[in-house]
Amino acid sequence: MLDRLLAAYRIETILRDLLVPYLHDLGERWARGEVSIAQEHFASNLLRGRLLGLARGWGQGHGPTAVLACLPSEQHDLGLIAFGITLYRRGWRIIYLGPDTPIATIRQAAESIAPDLVVLAGTVPEPFADHSDAIADLARHTTLALGGAGATEELATRTGARLLEQDPVSAAQSMDSAMPRPQHTSAPLGPA
């Protein structure tokens, strides 16, 4: 079914209008006890595998570089993957660190890669609050954005980070549009 949708619609449309709403609904149904944790994990892992297939090669992009990570104890990464796929389709190079990433690992990646953007994601506010000092320190050294239901405007303002829109496709499109691009000129370089 997903393959037929991918053949008929743009990936961004499928992510925004089908997969993200489905995942929200699945999470709500799990919270109400209508689906088991096994069913939720099965559906999420099936979608994760398919999305990561779409992300194949995203580490070799030639545009700006983004490091994407879920905060420590955060396992829900599908929105972050959708965000990364959208950036990748806009020419970005994606370094995906995954769920439950230690802050020290995120900091080390930011220092060694020197990305144009670091994105931290979380579905609940506690990991953001627990690591707010490290987040503020990271924001002083790189362009940092916070995403997911756990990220708040107050935290973004206090730490110096940007707050992403809740829709990962719109968030990626907004970040891409906000990033400066190198200016190319057609002027000659001078005598050979």
How would you name each of these model-derived features?
Residues V20, L71-E74, G150:
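Short glycine-enriched loops at secondary-structure junctions
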Residues G27, G84, E153:
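Short glycine-/small-residue-rich flexible loop motifs, especially phosphate/cofactor-binding loops
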Residues A43-T143:
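Conserved mid-sequence domains
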Residues T143-A149:
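Short beta-strand elements of ligand-binding domains
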Residues G150-A192:
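Peripheral docking tails and interdomain loops at the edges
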